[in-house]
Amino acid sequence: MSGPNRTYSFGEGDDGLAHPSSRTHAMHSQYDDVSPISDGARMNPMNGQGTDHGLASVPEDGHQGWGRGPEPSPSILTGSSATPGMDNLGPGAVGGGISGIALSVANSHDRLSGVEALMGTDGQEANIPAERGFSTTGSDNPYVPAPPEHRYSYGSNIALGAAAAPAGQLTPGQSVSHLSSSNPSQRNLYDIPYQGAGGLNAGPYQRHSAYSSNDLPVDINPDEIVDDGDDGFVPAPNSSSSARKSQAIPAAAGGAAAGGFLGNLGGLFGGKSAADTSYGPVPGAGLEAGEKGRWVKPKPGGGSKKRGWIVGAILAFIIIGAIVGGAVGGTIGHRGNEEPSSASSSSSSSTQTATDDTSTNGDLDKNSAEIKALMNNKNLHKVFPGIDYTPWGVQYPLCLKYPPSQNNVTRDMAVLTQLTNNVRLYGTDCNQTEMVLHAIDKLEIKDMKIWLGVWIDSNITTSRRQIDQLYKIIDDAKDTSIFNGAIVGNEALYRAGSDKTSAQTTLINYMQEVKDHFKKKNIDLPVATSDLGDNWDATLVQAADVVMANVHPFFGGIPVDQAAAWTWQFWQDHNVALTKGTNKKQVISEVGWPSGGGNDCGLGANCPNDTAGAVAGVDELNKFMEDWVCQALENGTDYFWFEAFDEPWKIVYNTANENWEDKWGLMDAARNLKPGLKIPDCGGKTATR
């Protein structure tokens, strides 16, 4: 899942295969035998009404007019090489900046403690909600970008966090229209269809955060700050075209850093080195923009603003210091903190660090009482071909100060092994892959496989660090048969905005580099990337060994009784059709449904009533699983479920009417199955890999 306002179009892709005039229903061809949907009424994707044509397809007349706003020029911002989202604490602003975030943490995360309470408080983007709420890599982070343009078809107002635009794709208060309405399948990350929504923008499925504030009192020159672009302190731009401005205010308290930013309009992958100094509204900069840029000079009257900033900074340090003070001991985000006594031990202490956990409980294994309890849940069934997973606390560089807990990963894997034999990761930072491998070894799981993940960022340093770590993991592995393949980038093209072509070239180069390394080491593993279903085209299909598409019916505003059919047909029309005549495998790399938080009518929480569109809830989640899981299992439809565990820290991305960001898990953060939720047992049939 990626950033906000992710929409699904029924128009053509780059190669035209999905155009109404040329696209055929794959469902009526060789794909009839893989539909996970039983016969029934076919739904009309445009009006949500069923017809008597079965559940097969979506009408071909999907093109609609798309509303567009004024077109200010995008700015080239600075891309951070820090793991998206979790390395930044909020908008740099007086009053409403660090201090505001600090108070928000104290008020909204009262159940959590220390750094755990800080997780996800990477900032606010006025009026724009985060998609999945992932501001970090992988399924644990909503990679939240600025939303795409406003449109009147199936839209996911919120891109699922793990996959959204990189930090700061938007200059606040502006809307930009870069793409022709004749190609609605392309996402525009610069429009703001949520005016007045008061939402948060970050970015997921992963997934980057953008921040803005309505009254930031001072301009800060980042050239005066020592910053190598890889520490999570990301400067934000000053936009003269908007009353709203963003500042970067680096601060530290007890090892925690706060930095407000509007990241990198200037480059998803093709960023220049940190030495480059290009900044400003440069049309078409996109992927080719520099990673660092000069700021405009402060406006007259900056003296009073500076005094206001100093006062605000002092207050901010006091408040942040008080909050983070409780984390100085190294408190980590520990799912075990809220575990029931039946499935926990003394490791559940809310004040334990990773080191404390290991000292108290040792290196947990299959014989540990806590693990035995976790692995004996009769309500869990191994019916999912794959599950998206990001371990708790693997956000770089915060993990250098507060390392994630190996025992927490082992606990997670003890649960996941009862749901699937196939886990997908989103990145390589903070030893997350190594910890998963260690957990599998300690639990003596023989049939678990891993899809390696590599987070591709706008900052070359980040991407290089991730890829180099992938090579180390592969080269150090005693047996590479545990790996199913490597996924290089998640929704990278979606986050590229109008620079999709340039981004695709860079992404393909990264994929080819990984392929070459595998070949050199005589490693036979597929290399793929994952992106929105309608961001795939023939060129990308040719470069990837597997076509992996993220498809979320909830953000399409699809009523749950039609969601399974819509998901399958969308995938067939936009992805499976592209592989015709090839031996390419197709996988739905993300699909799921939130257990609460409101309803989405395709363009956010703008529904006429609380029962319209896609409604989040346990009953609806049960219905979607009932219609999808066993049928997909029976017919061999390959997919990854998003996701196993709730992510409470993502509550910061919720808005008044969109409160689903932290509710995508089958289980809560303490690994308890949600009340009323029923995972289908599919008559005893289990997923095998």
Swiss-Prot record:
Reaction(s) catalysed (UniProt annotation): Hydrolysis of (1->3)-beta-D-glucosidic linkages in (1->3)-beta-D-glucans
Taxonomy, superkingdom: Eukaryota
A GO-annotated cellular component: fungal-type cell wall
Biased composition (Low complexity): 341-360
Matches recorded under InterPro entries: Beta-glucan_modifiers, Glycoside_hydrolase_SF
Record-annotated active site: 491 (proton donor), 590 (nucleophile)
Carbohydrate-modified residues: 408, 431, 459, 609, 635
Keyword entries, A-Z: Carbohydrate metabolism, Cell membrane, Cell wall biogenesis/degradation, Glycoprotein, Hydrolase, Membrane, Polysaccharide degradation, Signal-anchor, Transmembrane, Transmembrane helix
Region Disordered, residue ranges: 1-91, 128-147, 169-195, 334-365
Listed EC numbers: 3.2.1.39
Cell membrane found in the keyword field: yes
Residue spans crossing the bilayer: 308-328
Leader sequence residues: none
Protein name, per record: Probable glucan endo-1,3-beta-glucosidase btgC
Organism expressing this protein natively: Neosartorya fischeri (strain ATCC 1020 / DSM 3700 / CBS 544.65 / FGSC A1164 / JCM 1740 / NRRL 181 / WB 181)
Lineage, top ranks: Eukaryota, Fungi, Dikarya, Ascomycota, Pezizomycotina
